Amino acid sequence: MKILFVCQHYKPEPFRLSDICEDLVQRGHEVAVLTGIPNYPEGEIYADYRKRKKRRETINGVAIFRSYTIARRQNTLYRILNYFSFALSSTIGVIFGRYKAKDGSDFDCVFVNQLSPVMMAWASIAYKNKYNKPMFLYCMDVWPDSLIVGGVKENGLIYKIFEFVSKKVYQASDYIFVTSLSFKDYFVKKFNIPLHKITYLPQYAEDLFVPNELKTNKNTIDLTFAGNIGKAQNLETILKAASAIEQIPDLAKRVHFHFVGDGTELLNMQKLACELELENTSFYGRRPLEEMPDFYTKSDAMLVSLIGDSIISRTLPGKVQSYMAAGKPIIGAISGDTQRVVKEAKCGFISPEGNVDQLVRNIRKFCLLSVEEREKLGRQARCYYEEQFSKEWFMTYLENHLKEGFLS
């Protein structure tokens, strides 16, 4: 098959789509990606891509088409310009027929890896309509509800506008993959999407996340949060729990919290840690993917949290699969699919989002476990991952659905 992927972000930016595309190339498919100019997460165009350099390139067998993109910088105005510059330029490129397969023919299908914003799907709709090809959409961020996390009011004009835009995008898709089971009901009820068009396809973890022997000859219990640090992640709950832990005599000097990642709320969370005068927390910023297994190896358990009162709270963050692939127990302040998965896997402790007291109690429960009991939780996490979230299962399932959609 000849497959055109559309996503505003791609290698060298740190997104899993690169891994998916390269695997499909290994399976014998011709793969191209219509993407933006790298500028995430710092908000500045990468040095190697300035002055119109590398607008077309090939990375590990994947053909890359880069469309005009204004760097997101670090403020709201430029983020909006960033969103619309790619959405419009990529769509115009499709309309004028700029993106072709190696032999000059059309691609067999178009697949949008839909992160934020939902407008990045416009180019895929244009391709579908221009060439009469099936359109697949993999929904990673649900719009317009993702805007609520950023403070947009559900009854406000901005929300209503993007509700209309989102409905058009989702209804234009021939097939929709969702990362969480709860998204199925959302699409059916909010956008009247037929259930048969929606398929549950949970994310997987990169191959480098494998179980490693936990270092037990240490006096501390290390708890690690890894991933994006934004409003949706609600790190405030974890930091307040860290503050409460410091007031518990038998845990004050024993438990340490590690935060690995970057995002719009990083500075605010560092400021909150200072205001709480926390001595049991460390922030490391964004680290290369290759360094993450080392952080996991040093961790006794991994942390996950999300805000409540939103469809976002019911999602299954991709970090959960990475945690489980590494064979790590999970301690979370979260509901929805993550709560279901952790309970089914019997691999950790879950409390409602925002409930600091219950999170503290769960951390204390974990600390009272023996090394053998913690290791058992980790083994159960890895076992569940292999049964439900493995990369081989994901890629085969995706490949089969792409073929079925193309042939139908």
Predicted regions and their residues:
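N-terminal subdomain of nucleotide-sugar transferases
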Residues: 1-52, 56-57
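Carbohydrate-associated surface elements
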Residues: 37, 182, 201-204
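Membrane-proximal helix-turn-helix segments that form the acceptor-binding/catalytic region
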Residues: 119, 126-131, 156-176
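Conserved donor-binding/catalytic core segment of Leloir-type glycosyltransferases
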Residues: 216-243, 258
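Nucleotide-sugar-dependent
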Residues: 233, 288-295, 302-324, 331-340
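Nucleotide-activated donor-binding/catalytic signature segment of Leloir-type glycosyltransferases, i.e.
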Residues: 249-252, 256-260, 267-293
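A charged, aromatic-enriched C-terminal amphipathic alpha-helix characteristic of glycosyltransferases
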Residues: 358, 368-403
